[in-house]
Structure formats: C-alpha cells, structure tokens
C-alpha cells in the first residue's frame, strides 16, 4: 500500500467521528521505483492531508519531509523537494503491517500490500 492510498483511507466503523488518519504499524516496508512525474505530484499535492502524510512516512521509516506543508512557490521551483514527495507518495510500499483507527484502536491488516478495510458485522 502506498502512502498516497493511506492518505485517502479512513475508519468507517459505525459511530466513529475521527477515523482519520489511520495510524500505520509497519511490519515490512519496501521501495519500488516509479517514474518521476513532477506535474502529477504538483496536481496531487492539493489533495493530500500533509500532517497525515508526514506521520505515515515517518512510521514507515522515511523522515525526509518537513513538518510544515510547503507553499506553492516550492512546488513550482524545488525539484529535489518534489522528488522527496514523489518518493514518499509513490515509492514507499507497506507490504505487511496494520492500519489502526485513531478513535477505536481497531486494526485493519495489510497483507501483500493490500489493506483489508472490511468491517465486522457489529461495526456496520
């Protein structure tokens, strides 16, 4: 599971009001090279919840992103930053581990890079 995916997932258990961001418990993290496309990264930046991305990246062992979200000027001119963001969003893969609901503590397993977000009958 890539961090770009993680940034769009939330806990949908009935009654949960603060199910985002899911905390990552990383078991196995791998890196898979992906072609760098700066225009795609710039486009996706507006859709990303920055704090969740930084926390997710750090939980997967990647600490190259700044705490504070950069401004638009950085996105236009700072290619090294865009490459770091690209790496975090697209090249880091959580192969094994879990996503944990911040409100309930419910763990959603991640196996072979696929998060299992299915709810139990009593959670629907």
Swiss-Prot record:
Listed SUPFAM superfamilies: Trm112p-like
Name of the protein in question = Multifunctional methyltransferase subunit TRM112 homolog A
- CDD domains linked: Trm112-like
**PANTHER family (UniProt xref):** MULTIFUNCTIONAL METHYLTRANSFERASE SUBUNIT TRM112-LIKE PROTEIN, UPF0315 PROTEIN-RELATED
The record places domain TRM112 at 2-120
Q: Under the GO molecular function aspect, what terms does this record hold?
A: protein heterodimerization activity
The record's annotation in Gene3D superfamilies points to: 2.20.25.10
Name the source's superkingdom: Eukaryota
Q: For this entry, list what GO says about its biological process.
A: organ growth; regulation of cell cycle; regulation of cell population proliferation
**Oligomeric form and interacting partners:** Interacts with TRM9.
| Gene it is expressed from | TRM112A
Q: Which family does it belong to?
A: Belongs to the TRM112 family.
Phenotype upon loss of function: Semi-dwarf phenotype. Reduced organ growth due to inhibition of cell proliferation.
Task: Give the function comment from the record.
Answer: Acts as an activator of both rRNA/tRNA and protein methyltransferases. Required for TRM9 tRNA methyltransferase activity. Involved in the regulation of cell division progression during organ growth. Required for the expression of cell cycle-related genes, and the G2-M phase progression during organogenesis.
């Amino acid at each position: 599971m890539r961090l770009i995916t993680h940034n769009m997932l939330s806990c949908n258990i009935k009654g949960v009001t603060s199910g985002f961001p899911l905390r990552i418990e990383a078991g196995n993290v791998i890196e898979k090279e992906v072609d760098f496309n700066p225009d795609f990264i710039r486009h996706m930046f507006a859709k990303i919840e920055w704090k969740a991305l930084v926390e997710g990246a750090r939980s997967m062992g990647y600490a190259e992103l700044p705490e504070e979200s950069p401004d638009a000027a950085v996105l236009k001119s700072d290619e090294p930053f865009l490459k770091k963001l690209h790496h975090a969003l697209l090249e880091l893969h959580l192969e094994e581990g879990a996503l944990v609901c911040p409100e309930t503590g419910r763990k959603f397993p991640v196996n072979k890079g696929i998060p299992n977000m299915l709810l139990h009958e009593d959670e629907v």
